[in-house]
């Protein structure tokens, strides 16, 4: 049996990208939620190369009197999950909570995650109730969740919700992983001994627009498929075997029909032959594209470039800046 250690300090990690409108409310509500815990806490806000005034606002928040905010400024935009990993490398708490900056996941849910983690869970996930997103976002999310569940075998209901709590040893384990394509919720579940999900509220986005465009969602799907499992390669081999057997069977059938009905019948089956040919060609291109994705990610990992570069870390005035 593993001993259950109570949470002593909470670190809240929030990636920020062009969120100047929501930042004041985000900081106020998150601070209030953390103060209600009656524990030590820190709020780490990571500016992911914002082009608006977000970085300046984060610096001011860290330098305010009695601030608990640590601002981490990246030199450019690296993506949500890389920004969160940058925050993980600077946390000091024994429970780390991730939260989006758009306030669709209410910071007021933080005490519930802490209470559940105190029961001994390594990872506390969340499932959004009554999602206030567009039909396209909800449909894409359902497809991605099903894809993840089938390829990884991890039965979690809502991988897209970033409001989650991780014990410190889970975060330390993730920091030892050096692959460039990272999806934090799944990576955490690989190391978790005990994980659970709880329902949380989901609000409409009050400020700005979602930073996930259609193409970024497509890239995310490829990241999920190629960086976490080799199942698609095995499925590709199975599909190739089925197509090969099907093609051989059709060839035998065509020979039998030609011998039975004569060469005149074969001329009338030209379009069928073209259809079969195009099917094979399409399957080959799909396979080549998938293999290319894997090879591209291998190439990226072999280069071993850092997944992010921290330009500056601003801690509260009582602590030294880095």
Curated annotation (Swiss-Prot):
Its membrane topology: Multi-pass membrane protein
Keyword DNA-binding: no
Record keywords, A-Z: Antibiotic resistance, Cell inner membrane, Cell membrane, Glycosyltransferase, Lipid A biosynthesis, Lipid biosynthesis, Lipid metabolism, Lipopolysaccharide biosynthesis, Membrane, Transferase, Transmembrane, Transmembrane helix
UniProt pathway annotation: Glycolipid biosynthesis; 4-amino-4-deoxy-alpha-L-arabinose undecaprenyl phosphate biosynthesis; 4-amino-4-deoxy-alpha-L-arabinose undecaprenyl phosphate from UDP-4-deoxy-4-formamido-beta-L-arabinose and undecaprenyl phosphate: step 1/2; Bacterial outer membrane biogenesis; lipopolysaccharide biosynthesis
Topology feature Cytoplasmic, residues: 1-235, 291-322
EC assignment: 2.4.2.53
Enzyme class: transferase
Superkingdom of origin organism: Bacteria
UniProt cross-references to InterPro entries, sorted A to Z: ArnC_tfrase, Glyco_trans_2-like, Glycosyltransferase_2, Nucleotide-diphossugar_trans
Residue intervals annotated with topology Periplasmic: 257-269
Cellular-component GO terms for this entry: plasma membrane
Catalytic activity field: UDP-4-deoxy-4-formamido-beta-L-arabinose + di-trans,octa-cis-undecaprenyl phosphate = 4-deoxy-4-formamido-alpha-L-arabinopyranosyl di-trans,octa-cis-undecaprenyl phosphate + UDP
Nucleotide-binding in keyword set: no
Subcellular location: Cell inner membrane
Bilayer-spanning residue ranges: 236-256, 270-290
GO biological-process terms attached to the record: 4-amino-4-deoxy-alpha-L-arabinopyranosyl undecaprenyl phosphate biosynthetic process; lipid A biosynthetic process; lipopolysaccharide biosynthetic process; response to antibiotic
One function term, GO molecular function aspect: phosphotransferase activity, for other substituted phosphate groups
Record-linked NCBIfam families: PRK10714.1 (NF007986)
Record family assignment: Belongs to the glycosyltransferase 2 family.
PANTHER family, sorted: UNDECAPRENYL-PHOSPHATE 4-DEOXY-4-FORMAMIDO-L-ARABINOSE TRANSFERASE (PTHR48090:SF3), UNDECAPRENYL-PHOSPHATE 4-DEOXY-4-FORMAMIDO-L-ARABINOSE TRANSFERASE-RELATED (PTHR48090)
Function (record text): Catalyzes the transfer of 4-deoxy-4-formamido-L-arabinose from UDP to undecaprenyl phosphate. The modified arabinose is attached to lipid A and is required for resistance to polymyxin and cationic antimicrobial peptides.
Name used for this protein in its record: Undecaprenyl-phosphate 4-deoxy-4-formamido-L-arabinose transferase
Species name: Escherichia coli O17:K52:H18 (strain UMN026 / ExPEC)
């Amino acid at each position: 049996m593993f001993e259950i250690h109570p949470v002593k300090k909470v670190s809240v990690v929030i990636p920020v990208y062009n969120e100047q409108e929501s930042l004041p409310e985000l900081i106020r509500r998150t601070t209030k939620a953390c103060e209600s815990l009656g524990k030590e806490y820190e709020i780490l806000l990571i500016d992911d190369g914002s082009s608006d005034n977000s970085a300046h606002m984060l610096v001011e928040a860290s330098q305010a009197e009695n601030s608990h905010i640590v601002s981490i400024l990246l030199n450019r935009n690296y993506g949500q999950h890389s920004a969160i990993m940058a925050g993980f490398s600077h946390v000091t708490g024994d429970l780390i909570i991730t939260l989006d900056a758009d306030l669709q996941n209410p910071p007021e849910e933080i005490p519930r995650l802490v209470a559940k983690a105190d029961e001994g869970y390594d990872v506390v996930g969340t499932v959004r109730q009554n999602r206030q997103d567009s039909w396209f976002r909800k449909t894409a999310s359902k497809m991605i969740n099903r894809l993840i569940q089938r390829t990884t075998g991890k039965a979690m209901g809502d991988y897209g919700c970033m409001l989650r709590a991780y014990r410190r040893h889970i975060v330390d384990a993730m920091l030892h992983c050096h692959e460039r394509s990272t999806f934090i919720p799944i990576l955490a579940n690989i190391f978790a001994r005990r994980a659970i999900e709880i329902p949380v509220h989901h609000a409409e986005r009050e400020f700005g627009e979602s930073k996930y465009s259609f193409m970024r969602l497509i890239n995310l799907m490829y990241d999920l498929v190629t960086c976490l499992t080799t199942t698609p390669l095995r499925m590709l081999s199975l599909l190739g075997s089925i197509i090969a057997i099907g093609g051989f069977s059709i060839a035998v059938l065509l020979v039998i029909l030609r011998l039975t009905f004569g060469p005149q019948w074969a001329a009338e089956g030209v379009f069928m032959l073209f259809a079969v040919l195009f099917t094979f060609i399409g399957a080959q291109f799909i396979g080549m594209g998938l293999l290319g994705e894997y090879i591209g990610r291998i190439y990226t990992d072999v280069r071993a470039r850092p997944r992010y570069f921290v330009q500056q870390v601003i801690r509260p005035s009582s602590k030294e800046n880095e």
